[in-house]
From Swiss-Prot:
The gene is ilvC. Pathway: Amino-acid biosynthesis; L-isoleucine biosynthesis; L-isoleucine from 2-oxobutanoate: step 2/4; Amino-acid biosynthesis; L-valine biosynthesis; L-valine from pyruvate: step 2/4. This is Ketol-acid reductoisomerase (NADP(+)). Belongs to the ketol-acid reductoisomerase family. Substrate binds at residue 252. Gene3D superfamilies: 6.10.240.10, NAD(P)-binding Rossmann-like Domain. Keywords: Amino-acid biosynthesis, Branched-chain amino acid biosynthesis, Magnesium, Metal-binding, NADP, Oxidoreductase. Residues 2-182 form the KARI N-terminal Rossmann domain. Binds 2 magnesium ions per subunit. GO terms for molecular function: ketol-acid reductoisomerase activity; magnesium ion binding; NADP binding.
Length: 327
């Protein structure tokens, strides 16, 4: 059974009087920095000199330093730059300036789990991973709520690493919603598997294939778009709010019967076995190796694949339909 922490299980006291350096001021970095400051904690920001985010962070009242300087001033270092940029920045600007006993926080376990970043033994290494985009992290905090998060400890030098992680989670508002204790391995692997087989890869391909079938059968592309893509949000909202069974009780009996009898024939045991094979590639590290090598080459395959999606007929029809819907 998962261990879930809420506001009553966490305290901001471990962070009182300490300096927190947020490295990166993108959507997630900005949200977490603002939330922590609004929680009464001292936050500075570490950025590349001359980057676009420097002036933004400064205009919002933060002391901004180059990354190495921010790290040298910090008791807590939150690494909130993109995954694939982290190893280089870590090696050149973070690791040389870390204080003994510092707390290093990540929002995703990829680089630690796959050994691309290897922290020294004399620091705590934790993860607080909000399960929502940065915009929601900020908006929910301002509304007096929070988004759920995962929390993990990779290295417990101080003996209090979990307390620090929970304090960070409380500071960004996550304990208001609930924080699940996990491991770097579990967070990383489930995140990648979920993205590839369901949330990004699986859902995207299911929608594209459904659109292709309807158009190839002679139905109007505009009608096909609404049926397989636009209405997907309505169904996902129901699932998010009520669960799968609750969603079924929110649609017609015809939709229920058709979905329950035909769905398993489409997403069958063969599909499940392919999903498991993809999951095993993640677990073995094969996917991470492939992606790191692809990124090092300048991501040519990713760029080609992105272009193919951009040119898919559903995108051309969708652009017109979204103009009708959203102006």
């Amino acid at each position: 059974m998962a261990k879930i922490y809420t506001d009553k299980d966490a305290s901001l006291e471990p962070l009182r009087g300490k300096t927190i350096a947020v490295i990166g001021y993108g959507i997630q970095g900005r949200a977490q920095a603002l939330n922590l400051r609004d929680s009464g904690l001292k936050v500075i920001v570490g950025l590349r000199k001359g980057g676009n985010s420097w002036n933004v962070a400064a205009s919002e009242g933060f002391e901004v330093y180059e990354v190495g300087e921010a790290v040298s001033r910090a008791d807590v270092v939150m690494v909130l730059i993109p995954d694939m940029e982290q190893p280089k920045v870590w090696q050149s600007q973070i690791a040389p300036h870390l204080r003994e006993g510092a707390v290093v926080d990540f929002a995703h376990g990829f680089n630690i789990h796959y050994g691309l970043i290897k922290p020294p033994k004399n620091v705590d290494v934790v993860m607080v991973a909000p399960k929502a985009p940065g915009r929601a992290v900020r908006e929910e905090f301002l509304a007096g709520r929070g988004v759920p998060a995962l929390v993990a400890v990779h290295q417990n030098y101080s003996g209090s690493a979990l307390k620090y992680a929970l304090a960070i989670a409380k500071g960004i508002g996550a304990t208001r919603a609930g924080v699940i204790e996990t491991t770097f391995a579990e967070e990383t692997e489930t995140d990648l598997i979920g993205e590839q087989t369901v949330l990004v890869g699986g859902l995207m391909e299911l929608i594209k294939r459904g659109f292709e079938v309807l158009v190839e059968m002679g139905y109007q592309p505009e009608v096909a778009y609404f049926e397989v893509l636009n209405e997907a949000k309505l169904i996902m909202d129901l699932i998010w709010q009520r669960g799968i069974y609750g969603m079924l009780n929110g649609v017609s009996d015809t939709a229920k019967y058709g979905g329950l009898t035909v769905g398993p024939k489409i997403i069958d045991e063969e599909v499940k076995s392919k999903m498991k094979a993809a999951a095993l590639r993640v677990k073995s590290g094969e996917f991470a190796k492939e992606w790191v090598e692809e990124y090092a080459r300048g991501s040519p395959n990713l760029k080609r694949l992105m272009e193919s999606v951009k040119e898919h007929p559903i995108e051309k029809v969708g652009a017109e339909m979204r103009k009708l819907l959203f102006g």
